[in-house]
Curated annotation (Swiss-Prot):
Gene symbol of the encoding locus: ispE
E.C. designation(s): 2.7.1.148
Reaction catalysis annotation: 4-CDP-2-C-methyl-D-erythritol + ATP = 4-CDP-2-C-methyl-D-erythritol 2-phosphate + ADP + H(+)
Family: Belongs to the GHMP kinase family. IspE subfamily.
Name of this chain's protein: 4-diphosphocytidyl-2-C-methyl-D-erythritol kinase
Active site: K11, D137
UniProt GO molecular function: 4-(cytidine 5'-diphospho)-2-C-methyl-D-erythritol kinase activity; ATP binding
Organism: Haemophilus ducreyi (strain 35000HP / ATCC 700724)
Functional description taken from the UniProt entry: Catalyzes the phosphorylation of the position 2 hydroxy group of 4-diphosphocytidyl-2C-methyl-D-erythritol.
InterPro entries for this protein: GHMP_kinase_C_dom, GHMP_kinase_C_sf, GHMP_kinase_N_dom, IspE, Ribosomal_Su5_D2-typ_SF, Ribsml_uS5_D2-typ_fold_subgr
NCBIfam families listed in its UniProt record: ispE
EC category: transferase
Length: 282
């Protein structure tokens, strides 16, 4: 096989707590990831005549060398001394700066997809370790299962959750993750708790207060939607989400959203759509 089209799914942080900051600047956290059945789509073709990595469609304002897709392909190439190349096209549906994992998911899909097409033979654990150098969220997308993440995001405990319906909305702003994690008001001392204790609690996000203080668009949207459901932040935003018992209930609130606001209704997935697709070929 020399070509494959793979999903690059969105994720939600169902909760996110910051437990501390290491000497190297990375934050220690506890978060619960679940995948969604919506996302981007990545078309990967391999070339055997040369080792060039070609991106068919660049992201406006992002240099090729800084693009996580390109960096993921080059990283795998270097790690495995692979002499083959690739041509990669992305159909983008997820927003940048949304907190639903678009860039990290793209990087993971490329790592997993090229490992399959190039037959480089790395395990998922090896790919996840490789992906961590690209971003703290990349390993969860590589692993492909709903998981409780600790450390800086690299310590993963798979778990099963109800696959609920979610409404995800994004105000017309993008939020740089680094700006939130650098904010002096960000809580960094939330006590670590066991997964069983966290699953028994109401869930929250330590980044939400800071985001709502700095971005009135997020604050105003959450307040406006309180009449329908309690929305909360995913990641560092700007997307917010709420859970619903049915697709119909989620779509009803979606139809009441502010005019032309970006959003989607999606179902939680305990197994990543990426891995479901790859399993069809194995």
């Amino acid at each position: 096989m020399n070509r494959i089209i793979l999903p690059s799914p969105a994720k939600l942080n169902l909760f996110l707590y910051i437990n501390g900051r290491r000497a190297d600047g990375y934050h220690q956290l506890q978060t619960l990831f679940q995948f969604l059945d919506v996302g981007d789509e990545i078309d990967i073709s391999i070339t055997t005549s040369n080792s060039t990595i070609e991106l068919v469609n660049d992201i406006a304002g992002v240099a090729t060398e800084d693009n996580l897709i390109y960096r993921a392909a080059k990283l795998l190439q270097k790690k495995t001394a692979c002499q083959q190349g690739a041509k990669i096209a992305v159909a983008k549906h997820l927003p940048m700066g949304g907190g639903v994992g678009g860039g990290s998911s793209n990087a993971a899909t490329v790592l997993v997809g090229l490992n399959y097409l190039w037959q480089t033979g790395l395990s998922l654990a090896q790919l996840a370790e490789l992906g961590l150098s690209l971003g703290a969220d990349v390993p969860i997308f590589v692993a492909g299962k709903t998981a409780f993440a600790e450390g800086i995001g690299e310590i993963l405990t798979p778990c099963e959750l109800p696959e609920k319906w979610y409404l995800v909305l994004k105000p017309n702003i993008s939020i740089e993750t680094s700006s939130i994690f650098k904010d002096p008001k960000l809580p960094r001392n939330t006590p670590e708790r066991s997964l069983s204790a966290l699953l028994a609690e109401d869930w929250g996000n330590d980044c939400e207060k800071v985001v709502r203080e700095h971005y009135s668009e997020v604050e105003d949207l959450i307040q406006e939607l309180l009449q329908y459901a309690p929305f909360r932040l995913t990641g560092t935003g700007a997307c917010i989400f709420a859970e619903f018992a049915s697709k119909a209930e989620a779509e009803k609130v979606f139809n009441c959203r502010p005019h032309n606001m970006y959003g989607f209704v999606a179902k939680g997935q305990n197994i990543s759509p990426l891995h479901k697709k790859l399993n069809l070929f194995s």
